[in-house]
């Protein structure tokens, strides 16, 4: 899980979702998981 000021999809399987008011990227590749913070 990476915490960054701006989250962007890295590959075509990355999905941007909102969880509890936080923007996150979920993906099949665990290296692509990101959280905004």
From Swiss-Prot:
One biological process term from GO is: translation
List the InterPro entries.
Ribosomal_bL36, Ribosomal_bL36_sp
Q: Name one GO cellular component term.
A: cytoplasm
Q: Which domain of life is it from?
A: Bacteria
Please list the GO terms describing molecular function.
structural constituent of ribosome
Q: Which keywords does UniProt give here?
A: Ribonucleoprotein, Ribosomal protein
Name the family: Belongs to the bacterial ribosomal protein bL36 family.
What protein name does the entry list? Large ribosomal subunit protein bL36
- Species the sequence originates in: Alkaliphilus oremlandii (strain OhILAs) (Clostridium oremlandii (strain OhILAs))
């Amino acid at each position: 899980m990476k915490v960054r000021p701006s989250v962007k999809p890295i590959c075509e399987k990355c999905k941007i979702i909102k969880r509890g008011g936080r923007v996150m990227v979920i993906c099949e590749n665990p290296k692509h998981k990101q959280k905004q913070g």
